[in-house]
């Protein structure tokens, strides 16, 4: 197993981890029922996409 050569400072550790955060996904309201959903996706509740009724079997 590898052994570190030098101790990693708090600053360097923080800089390394600066990109590890989670991002919040955008949500939009459905045009028909108003439920929150991801953009460019059909609504699972009312089966519509851009006010067009989908026939899902």
Curated annotation (Swiss-Prot):
One of its GO terms (molecular function) is structural constituent of ribosome. Residues 1-20 are annotated as: Disordered. One of its GO terms (biological process) is translation. Keywords: Ribonucleoprotein, Ribosomal protein. Pfam families: Ribosomal_L32p. Residues 7-19 have a biased composition (Basic residues). The keyword Ribonucleoprotein applies. It comes from the Bacteria. GO terms for cellular component: large ribosomal subunit. Belongs to the bacterial ribosomal protein bL32 family. This is Large ribosomal subunit protein bL32. It comes from Ureaplasma urealyticum serovar 10 (strain ATCC 33699 / Western). The lineage of its organism: Bacteria, Bacillati, Mycoplasmatota, Mycoplasmoidales, Mycoplasmoidaceae.
């Amino acid at each position: 197993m590898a052994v570190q050569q030098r101790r990693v400072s708090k600053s360097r550790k923080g800089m390394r981890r600066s990109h590890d955060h989670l991002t919040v996904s955008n949500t939009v309201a459905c045009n028909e029922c108003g439920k929150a959903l991801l953009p460019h996706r059909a609504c699972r509740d009312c089966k519509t996409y851009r006010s067009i009724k989908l026939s899902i079997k």
